[in-house]
Amino acid sequence: MTNIRKTHPLMKIINNSFIDLPTPSNISAWWNFGSLLGICLILHILTGLFLAMHYTSDTTTAFSSVTHICRDVNYGWIIRYLHANGASMFFICLYMHVGRGLYYGSYTFTETWNIGIILLFTVMATAFMGYVLPWGQMSFWGATVITNLLSAIPYIGTDLVQWIWGGFSVDKATLTRFFAFHFILPFVVLALAAVHLLFLHETGSNNPSGIMSDSDKIPFHPYYTIKDILGALLLILVLTLLVLFSPDLLGDPDNYIPANPLNTPPHIKPEWYFLFAYAILRSIPNKLGGVLALVLSILILAIVPLLHTSKQRGMMFRPISQCLFWLLVADLLTLTWIGGQPVEHPYITIGQLASILYFTILLVLMPIASIVENNILKW
C-alpha cells in the first residue's frame, strides 16, 4: 500500500515541500534563514492577532490601549515584546537571507529572487505601519516624515500624501487605515512566501559551491528538518533573552511619550533595521533625489542578476568578490550607525561617502571584479 503522505492531495504538497524534497547534500547553516523567516512570520501573525484583540486604532485611546495590554492583560507584556522584538529578529534573518543570496549567487533564480524583493518591500511596509500603531512620539513623527516623502513626486505628490493621510495631517483616519493594512499585509506576505517557495522548488536549491547538485541530493527530512530545528532553537533563545532581559534595548524611549503634534522630538529616526536606508535618504540634500536613492537602495537588488558577469555562480572561489562583499557588509553597518546619529558635521560626510560606496560596490566594482577573476582563470 502506498504511503498516505504520497497520495493524499494535501499531504502530497507538504511531502514534496518539506519531507521528500531533494536537497543538495552540502548546504550550510546560511540556508537555515528561510525556515527561520517562516517561524518569525507565524510568531508575528499569532502575537499580532492577540494584540489586535485588545488594541484600539483611535488617536485618543491607541497609546493607552497599548499601556493596558502591557499592564492589565494576562501576559500582555510578553505578547507585546515578542511582537516588537520579533520584528528585529525577522529583519536580522531577512538581511542574512538576502546576503546569502548575494554571496552564493542565488539571484540567478530570477523568479524566486524577484518574488523575494517584493516580499522584502512588503515586510518593510508592514513593519513601518506597525511602528505607527502605539501612537507614541516617534510613531507619529515617523509616520509624518516618511509619508511626507511622497510629496517629492512631481505634480501629484501633495494630493497623494493627503490621500494617504485621509486628511491634511497624520490623524485618526491615518491610524485606522495603517492598522487595517498592518493587519492584512502579513497574510499577503504569507501568500507571497508560498509563491517564493513554489518558484524555488521548480529549480531546486542552490548550494555553496554554486555547481549543479542533481547527482548528489538527499531528502529534506530528517537531515535538514533537524538542522532547521537547531536554528529555530537558537532564534528562540536569542528572542527570549531579548524579551525577558532587555525588551526596550532596540526600541526608542521617545515612543513612551504619547504623540504630540505640537512637539517635535530632537532626533526623528526609524527602527534600527531601516537606519541604513534612512542614512542614504538623508545623505542627498535634495528631497526627490533622496527619495529616489531610498527606493533604489532596495530596488538595486533587482538589477544584481543583470550585472552578474562572472563565469562562476557563487563567491566561494572568488577572493576579490569576497572582499568586496564584506566591504559592502561593513558599509551597510556604517550606514546603520550614521542613520542613528544627528545631522551634523562629521556624520553628514561619512553618510555621503558610505552611500556613494554602497552603490559603487554593487553597480561598478563587483561586475569589474568578476571580469578580472574570469581573466585570471583564463575563462
Swiss-Prot record:
Places the protein is found: Mitochondrion inner membrane
UniProt keywords, alphabetically: Electron transport, Heme, Iron, Membrane, Metal-binding, Mitochondrion, Mitochondrion inner membrane, Respiratory chain, Transmembrane, Transmembrane helix, Transport, Ubiquinone
Residues at which heme b b562 binds: H83, H182
GO molecular function: metal ion binding; ubiquinol-cytochrome-c reductase activity
Record flagged with keyword Transport: yes
Keyword tRNA-binding: no
A Pfam short name: Cytochrom_B_C
Gene3D superfamilies per UniProt: Cytochrome Bc1 Complex, Chain C (1.20.810.10)
Cellular component terms per the entry's GO annotation: mitochondrial inner membrane; respiratory chain complex III
Transmembrane region(s): 33-53, 77-98, 113-133, 178-198, 226-246, 288-308, 320-340, 347-367
Major subcellular site: mitochondrion
Binding site for a ubiquinone: H201
Domain of life: Eukaryota
GO BP terms in the entry: mitochondrial electron transport, ubiquinol to cytochrome c
InterPro entries, per database record: Cyt_b/b6_C, Cyt_b/b6_C_sf, Cyt_b/b6_N, Cytb/b6-like_sf, Cytochrome_b, Cytochrome_b_C_euk/bac, Cytochrome_b_N_euk/bac, Di-haem_cyt_TM
List of residues binding heme b b566: H97, H196
Cofactor: heme b
Membrane topology field: Multi-pass membrane protein
Annotated cofactor note: Binds 2 heme b groups non-covalently.
Miscellaneous comment as given in the Swiss-Prot or TrEMBL entry: Heme 1 (or BL or b562) is low-potential and absorbs at about 562 nm, and heme 2 (or BH or b566) is high-potential and absorbs at about 566 nm.
Function statement: Component of the ubiquinol-cytochrome c reductase complex (complex III or cytochrome b-c1 complex) that is part of the mitochondrial respiratory chain. The b-c1 complex mediates electron transfer from ubiquinol to cytochrome c. Contributes to the generation of a proton gradient across the mitochondrial membrane that is then used for ATP synthesis.
Family: Belongs to the cytochrome b family.
Subunit structure: The cytochrome bc1 complex contains 11 subunits: 3 respiratory subunits (MT-CYB, CYC1 and UQCRFS1), 2 core proteins (UQCRC1 and UQCRC2) and 6 low-molecular weight proteins (UQCRH/QCR6, UQCRB/QCR7, UQCRQ/QCR8, UQCR10/QCR9, UQCR11/QCR10 and a cleavage product of UQCRFS1). This cytochrome bc1 complex then forms a dimer.
Protein name: Cytochrome b
